[in-house]
Structures are given as structure tokens and as C-alpha cells.
Amino acid sequence: MSAPILTSAAFPAKQLKVGGVTAFSATDYPGKFAAVVFVQGCPWHCGYCHNPHLQKRTGHSPLAWSQVLAHLQRRVALIDAVVFSGGEPTMDPALAEAMRQVHALGFGVGLHSAGIYPRRLAEVLPLVDWVGIDVKASSPAYDGVTGSSDSARLALESAEAVLASGAAYEFRTTVHPALHTPEDILALAQTLRALGVRHYALQVFRATGCADEGLKATSTADYPGAELVAQVSGLFKTFTLRRE
């Protein structure tokens, strides 16, 4: 069951649990220069996660939101947008109010989410200018990747919410040969196309930050192969392959 919606009035932005900030990124929001705010906490345990240090939601926030906001105020006219990433940002009930404060500074708002909390995602989508949705696997393989039951259903609900919202988006999947067979990848792409997804990316597993030694040892830079990439590419209006 997805988490209940908790209003921003009850959770002011100062309560946002920030795990870190990247001052400048040209890759986290397509076509924009952005700062990235990393929010603590994620209930899923994907083996290929490159931010495992953010999975635990602690009582202490390494950075106060007031510090982050002051930093962003100094970046006005230097960057275009602020992306909330994680962890899973929608886990934090203070996210909506933090987004409003970012908008008030004149920045665009981006969001990276795995769609773990469909109702919370739906709450913040009206505040989002662009959202990147991490789709983990085809439905039968989903729980094996996330380490959590019922994860495919939650992801599907979130995908439907994003498509219904009208927000600019990208769906993307990080692939590893030990987790995703070519058949799985193609089946997932076909499912997304049938849902109405038009913008999709495949991202090759990155060893940087990953805590799973087995996945690091069995990764290969040439997976997926060119034939599969061509099949997937043809299903979408825009398609991106990220090998780095």
C-alpha cells in the first residue's frame, strides 16, 4: 500500500532531510543547468544503486534546508533548475513545500523518482516541471531488483500518474546482464510503449558507488547489444542510450 498523503502545512520545508547537494549538473535535467538536492531515505534496496548511503533515513540531516536555500539564492541566474533526487525524494513529506520555495526563487523544478509512493508523487507532480522516472524491470522481475514486494504495482501506478499529469518526463531503466535479460528489456520497453510512454532511456550499470561486489564483477560495458538497442529505440519518439 502506498503511503498516505501528508500535507505540506504539517511538514514545512525546514524539515526536509537533505543528504547532500551537487552545486552544478548538466546531466540531471535535460537541457538545463541544475543543482541537485539529494533527499535521505529509500525503502527499496536495488543492488546497482550508486547512492546506497542515502537509503537509510536518519534522524539527523547533514545539511539544514536553510543552508541549501541560502546556497540556491546565491545561484540565481547561474543555474536554471533544481532537481530533487535521492534516495527517494517522495518519501519526505516536506518535499512539496521545498519545491514551492525553489519555484519562488525562479528556478525550474526537476524530480528523480522510482515511483515508490504513487499518491505522494501525484501530490507533487503539479509542482514539477520535469520528472525522471526510474523503471526497474519487467513486472515479473521487479521485486527481485528492488528487494521489496508489490513494487511493480506501485511503479505502474506512478507511471500512469506521470503520464496523466502532462508534466515533461523521461522514463529510464538501468540495466545489468545479471538482472535484465534481453527478453526482459524488450518486454519492459513494449509495456511502457503500450502505456503511452514516448520518452525513454536505457542506462548501462555504473560501478561507481555500487556496494554489490558481484554486480561490479559481472558488469560489461557493451550490454545491451546493438540489435536490442535498435529494437527498443524504434518503440519511442525519443530514445537515449547512456553508457557512462
Tell where the protein language model's regions lie, with residue ranges:
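Conserved AdoMet/S-adenosylmethionine-binding subsite of the radical SAM
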Residues: 69-81, 90-217
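Non-heme iron-sulfur electron-transfer modules
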Residues: 11-17, 56-70
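Glycine-rich phosphate-binding "P-loop"
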Residues: 54-60, 81-88
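Canonical Radical SAM [4Fe-4S] cluster-binding loop centered on the CxxxCxxC motif
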Residues: 6, 27-63
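Short, well-ordered turn and helix-capping elements at secondary-structure junctions
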Residues: 22-25, 53, 86-88, 115, ...
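Flexible, glycine- and charge-enriched loops at secondary-structure boundaries
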Residues: 58-62, 148-152, 218, 222-225
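Auxiliary Fe-S-binding modules of radical SAM enzymes
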Residues: 1-27, 31, 177-244
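Short beta-strand segments
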Residues: 40, 85, 134
